[in-house]
Amino acid sequence: LYIEADEDHVSLQFRDKKGDLEENENHRKNNCLITKLVYVHEGIEKESPKSERHRLINPYYFCGTSYGEENTAFWDEVYEYINNHYDLDKVKKIYMNADGGAWIKSGMRRIAGITYVLDEFHIEKYLTKLTSHMKDSREDAADELRAAIRSKTKKDFEEIIDRLEGCLENETGQKRISDAKEYILSNWMAAKLRLRHQDGVKGSSTEGHVSHVLSSRMSSRPMGWSIT
């Protein structure tokens, strides 16, 4: 069984009523709302025997804008659906495909036996941040990092990054590399599972589903939105 989770950032016209958006000290308005998407499915299959397109098996979607205790209630709704529709004693494994956001990790702690797998999009995003300054050697450097994540230790991974950091032409890229390194290290086992491609680990479709389910109406081709 698979649970996938991601989010979209929606720009609001107002929060509760027109004119209530405020600016902070950096002159940015508080008009961003995080919309959460979680969906449960049983795997991936071809749309037809000869098709190159694939589809999720029995997907069920949940959307919300919850925070704090409401986030707990949001995840409870997800797990209530799972408990009501599946005999968990017969489910061999539940995989969580996600980017490791705090609201997602808090949800994972609410059910036993979840195996967290980092999605490909975010692995590649942060590998690019670590290697973008390598230019023509970028892909070779990324391959070396993938190999370290897949089958070596955190120490091996950090030694490669130290070497890559030494190739920076100036100090402007240091924070980029530091942040990307910290992200992968904080999701280390989840990244390993993704890159090892073991049985049961399926490709994540979160970015595509966020685009189709949320972004098409809320951010990339938006309508007008408020909280109320």
Language-model features and meaning:
Residues L1-T228:
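Catalytic center-proximal scaffold of phosphoryl-transfer enzymes
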